[in-house]
């Protein structure tokens, strides 16, 4: 195993010869690696620009997945380094996101189910508020499109002409508007390009802005379960906007 390439909340990425291995934290179960490798392989089979998945390995009592190595910096890094090119990158991201949504995803888990489970489990909202959210979510469209789950510039690598999307554990089936709203939320919390990204996606797809923003209270409530430092206050404000 070679040098450490990246560190995430759930895993570390190391060089593995000419490839890389995503090595999960020691507490991660064997089925986590196999499940996520299967998800990635299913996305790869659709012809989307993702790294090839090669195998599941156990290394030093930790489970991991071996992928092709992707060269180049993330779009987030490139955007920070060239503010003038941000509109171009957002257009590329929007087109790529729409390309993902072009695929049906009947074999994937349900986006609304994932959101509902997270909303029901958060203790940061009282029971009446959770029930209001769950009732509203039930009336939102189901959809049958492939959704990335947390599509944002950190997980898109490489050249603007050949972007590669990495890290697919949250891939699911649902309404593209709900998926885009999740991206909008992440960008709103951590960058100042959320509105511009939303405009770019709406321009590419002709989906009304309001259709996407209708998902915002549900996306924000579900995000509370992830316990990301510094997000709680703003998420609660968005939830209470319902």
What does each of the following model-derived ranges do?
Residues 60-74:
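Conserved short submotifs of the Hanks-type protein kinase catalytic core
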Residues 4-34:
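ATP-binding glycine-rich loop module of kinase domains
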Residues 102-149, 159:
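An alpha-helical support segment within catalytic cores of ATP-dependent transferases
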Residues 12-15, 134-178:
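Active-site acidic catalytic loop and adjacent metal/ATP-binding pocket
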Residues 83-113:
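Internal "kinase-insert"/substrate-recognition segments embedded within catalytic cores
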Residues 31-46:
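The N-lobe alphaC helix and its flanking beta3-alphaC-beta4 segment of protein kinase-like domains
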Residues 72, 175, 182-242:
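Helix-rich C-terminal or lid/interface subdomains of diverse kinases
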Residues 44-55:
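Conserved HxN/HPN-centered segment at the entrance to the catalytic loop
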